Amino acid sequence: MLITDKLLLSYQRCHLRAFLDTCGDWKQLDPPSDFLLKLMRDSATYQQQALEDETYQQPYYPRGDWEAGAAATLSLMQQGVDRIYRGVLIQGEFGQTNGATTSLVGIDSQYFPEFGELPETPVHLSSSNLPSSNITLISRPHLLIKQPGQSKFGDWSYITADIWLSKRPKQEYQIIAAFHAHVLASVQETMPEAAWLMLRKKGWWQVNLDQRTPQMFEILDDCIQMIENRDKPEVFISRQKCNLCGWYTICHAEAESIKHLSLLPGVTASRYARLKTLEITDVEALANASSELLAEYPEFPDRVAFDVVQQAQSHLLNQPLLREEGSSATDFVTDVTDRSSATDFVTDVTDRSSAANTVGDLTNLTDVGVRKERIREEAEVNQFIILPEVVEKSLAKVNLVVRNTTENKPATSSIPAPILRNKPIPYSQSVFLPIAPIELYFDIEAEPELNLDYLHGVLVVDRCNNTEKFHGFLAESAAEEGAIWEQFLELMWTYPIAPIFHFCDYEVKTFKRLAKLYNTPAYLWKPVLKRFVDIHKQVTQKAIMPVESYALKPIARWLGFDWRDAKANGAQCVCWYDDWLKTGDRSLLEAIVRYNEDDCRATYIVKDWLTNFLLKHEP
């Protein structure tokens, strides 16, 4: 049986992923997205930058021939080379499975070498019995660093160091460091004195091997048992961890086919484990469960039990439900996203001699910016809108013009909310969203690695004249960020009392950041900030919807809205903008603006739907 450091890393993130990496059909893997490839390049670049002042040697061997790699590495260690980059360490009988030599090409990655092609010789361990007495461990630390001390080589030994793009010393990285140390000890016949991680911003970070080694052995043993017994783990969809995984499509299809509870917002792995002990394993059972019973368990604190049961009821009925006061989806939904943390979840992807390693734990960047922070009190939402007392009136549906630059279908919309009613909505009824003659819908596109917010998109909806106009303030380079900030502010003051609707709190945080960065006078930005209304916050506080996630795309698509570019999402826009800076291809900017406009329109659709929904449930 062949166990590599990359397989062990996959196992820590998802047992099923590790199982499929070894026993699955590689032909079913999803092709890598542009964003995944970008993250891989970023990780490789970071490693190169970290090593630019280092003097090192690297073993050379045919791609995928780990036995040759181990021999070349051992030769460098015997010579006493100070730094060895991407060495190969092997413990156990190499390449033996039931007495027959097994190729290792492709064994430790999901789908493709760094440059994108599929492995030439896929390995299917499921076709063989895997005796636990015949285990080969393969470790490939980023650096082997020479230290004083006795080993079989002489009066020197080696320690390991891994270079991660992450800002944090995650436990999974520390476990891999302990794995490296264990295999290294068998090679040099002495336990390394230390193991290190090099992290972005934190720099060098020492792993506590006394703490992590026992944990590593427990995880390693569980992984070996799973593969040895070919015990396929149960599917579980976790949007934070699954979105960039190459097995996502087949796993999601399996989950959908059985209506797995992990598809419900709020059903985390720990909560699902508790539900299984209560024999609640399907949507119908959860919909009929007692929230009072669930609330007795620590996995369901406060109102989470009631919310989860309601969520199941909404899915079972395939219709939205009114959320009771004091309850909020943001209190129990964990499939949230964060633009600033994407690179924290990049695995090591610089090994040019093997299939590219997968990226795990990445938050879903396709709908950017869901966070829990409360931005302001509910009462502030309605304080600036006056509703005239005239007859009820409905607006026509939005008609979008398809640009000639795309052949994709135009965005579609649901029925807009009425601007007026037979009686005005009292200010005290905070359950209602503002309905104003002119409304602004705002969305930002950003490049996190450059700390650049390069596009402010605003849809101006004039309900009195039944018109809509989109404004895209685009910075074609970082130098133009300040200029588009001023242009955006000028538009906000063109409509000095219009509410500004956005989805999630990224826009608010960025608005504050830019005001500070460009020394904007308080009188120009603080009154504008008070006009912001977070539609995500309103939806999650007021409604239970039959969606997999309370991100913008699942909600808007459930309402019938479609983005014109099926491929487009926030992560793809990061790639497009990065490519624009390199190539100057203006079609990339047009695609970004088109996507941003559709995000604004989707926010408009969700806001109008929610307004109508709340009006319908008015007491």
Give the positions of each predicted feature.
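Short, amphipathic alpha-helical segments that act as regulatory/interfacial helices
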Residues: 51, 181, 512, 604-611
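Short linear loop/turn motifs
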Residues: 65-68, 289-290, 379, 389-394, ...
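Conserved DEDDh/DEDDy metal-dependent 3′-5′ exonuclease domain
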Residues: 84-95, 105, 111, 131-134, ...
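C-terminal extensions
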Residues: 248-265, 269-278, 282-476, 481, ...
